[in-house]
């Protein structure tokens, strides 16, 4: 879909495509990804492990002899890896990602403030004022959110802050942290 969307109907050239995949996929799954990418219109397809791609994106010197831990929180899973000398030394993953964080925020706001918000608002809170650590009053960020009052059913606006997000996602973040410690 993405290749067709990018190139349109007129194909002057076929692109070479780099596909990021989880570090732990099998060789059969790797072949399937390459074949599907070529079938979608790519001239060639290359595989890069997601933690390596994340490390490159974060300007981590992956070729050095020093070990670097990368935690890549995706939509559905979080992948942790130790990278050294350009490769993955050790990796693991857990089925906790951004989507679960959004749902945790949504539930927290509903339970604590009796305000029903949507997933888009929860994600916006995570992106704009989110923090994995509790912040002091001088450091925390705030934003206004709109939702539906859980009692009256009427629209309501309220201000939330970084510590609301931290409290909401603390359980999920603990799961990610405990998994990372296993490497």
Q: What annotation goes with each model-predicted range?
A:
Residues 76:
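Conserved Rossmann-like nucleotide-cofactor binding loop
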């Amino acid at each position: 879909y993405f290749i067709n969307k990018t190139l349109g109907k007129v194909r002057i050239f076929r692109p070479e495509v780099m596909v990021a995949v989880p570090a732990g996929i099998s060789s059969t799954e790797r072949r399937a990804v390459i074949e599907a990418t070529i079938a979608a219109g790519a001239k060639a397809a290359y595989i890069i492990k997601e933690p390596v791609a994340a490390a490159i994106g974060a300007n981590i010197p992956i070729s050095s002899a020093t070990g670097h831990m990368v935690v890549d929180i995706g939509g559905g899973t979080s992948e942790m890896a130790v990278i050294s000398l350009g490769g993955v030394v050790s990796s693991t993953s857990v089925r906790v990602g951004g989507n679960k964080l959004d749902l945790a925020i949504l539930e927290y706001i509903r339970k604590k403030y009796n305000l029903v918000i949507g997933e888009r608002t929860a994600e916006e809170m995570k992106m704009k004022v989110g923090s994995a650590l509790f912040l002091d009053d001088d450091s925390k960020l705030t934003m206004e959110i709109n939702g539906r009052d859980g009692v009256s059913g009427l629209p309501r606006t309220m201000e939330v802050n970084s510590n609301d997000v931290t409290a909401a996602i603390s359980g999920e973040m603990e799961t990610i942290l405990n998994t990372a410690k296993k490497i």
